[in-house]
Amino acid sequence: MAKTRTSSLRNRRQLKPAVAATADDDKDGVFMVLLSCFKIFVCFAIVLITAVAWGLIMVLLLPWPYMRIRLGNLYGHIIGGLVIWIYGIPIKIQGSEHTKKRAIYISNHASPIDAFFVMWLAPIGTVGVAKKEVIWYPLLGQLYTLAHHIRIDRSNPAAAIQSMKEAVRVITEKNLSLIMFPEGTRSRDGRLLPFKKGFVHLALQSHLPIVPMILTGTHLAWRKGTFRVRPVPITVKYLPPINTDDWTVDKIDDYVKMIHDVYVRNLPASQKPLGSTNRSN
């Protein structure tokens, strides 16, 4: 009985940051909400205009897919950085020295704004890996496809495996990196979700190291289902590359758990999965 009460109290403590964030939104007032909506409108207009222009360039470059990848990265650097600047979000980046070499970059996914961080911070020569439905995301989904990034059909295992094999072939031949969200979807409350196995399969086939990107605070800056962007301090932390040269197929589940545990240790309590705050930070 005592153990049950302790667990209940721990879960309540973990929910406090989310409750506090909701209370803060209520206190923001009409002006701040309208200002946030205005910023979102401005960013949407910028993305709309530039996406159309950049999309035309991509169409002209259809015969040169790898040039499209690099130009797509350049577009992401410019637009991603501009959007974050307009929102006025204070950012701290740690460990950027770990982005100098080819790798599989992975990031937790807790907010709509994460996509702009990934666009902004992905090194030139990085291929994105996402679910096939990304093509239906307005503007960015179409640019993603035109930029020759990879879409995975998760409902069809055979097709997904073939897509990953093609991804490995491309990045090996052209000396490219990969970037993806291993959770496979966006968290509703900012807490880390279980990881899919795709990034481990890619590591096994490519032998590229894995570089974890730890995004902290994005779930408070822009929460799923809202139009309120708040200037909450955000930290982007790159961890040292994790070598995969000696990884073997029979330990896939172990590798997924190991990398997931790396995130649990490095995320704040408000972003850890429920019941995991007893692990070291």
From Swiss-Prot:
Presence of the UniProt keyword Ligase in the record: no
Domain of life from the UniProt record: Eukaryota
Pathway: Phospholipid metabolism; CDP-diacylglycerol biosynthesis; CDP-diacylglycerol from sn-glycerol 3-phosphate: step 2/3
Motif interval(s): HXXXXD motif: 109-114
Enzyme class: transferase
Catalytic activity of the protein: a 1-acyl-sn-glycero-3-phosphate + an acyl-CoA = a 1,2-diacyl-sn-glycero-3-phosphate + CoA
GO cellular component: endoplasmic reticulum; membrane
Any one Gene Ontology molecular-function term assigned to this protein's record: 1-acylglycerol-3-phosphate O-acyltransferase activity
Cysteine pairs bridged by disulfides in the record: none
Any GO BP annotation: CDP-diacylglycerol biosynthetic process
Alphabetical keyword list: Acyltransferase, Lipid biosynthesis, Lipid metabolism, Membrane, Phospholipid biosynthesis, Phospholipid metabolism, Transferase, Transmembrane, Transmembrane helix
Cellular localization per UniProt: Membrane
Pfam families per the UniProt record, alphabetical: Acyltransferase
UniProt-listed Enzyme Commission number(s): 2.3.1.51
Annotated transmembrane regions: 40-60, 71-91, 110-130
Coiled coil feature spans: none
Membrane topology annotation: Multi-pass membrane protein
Its biological purpose: Converts lysophosphatidic acid (LPA) into phosphatidic acid by incorporating acyl moiety at the 2 position. This enzyme uses erucoyl-CoA as an acyl donor.
Family to which this protein belongs: Belongs to the 1-acyl-sn-glycerol-3-phosphate acyltransferase family.
Domain-level remarks: The HXXXXD motif is essential for acyltransferase activity and may constitute the binding site for the phosphate moiety of the glycerol-3-phosphate.
Protein name: 1-acyl-sn-glycerol-3-phosphate acyltransferase
Organism lineage: Eukaryota, Viridiplantae, Streptophyta, Embryophyta, Tracheophyta
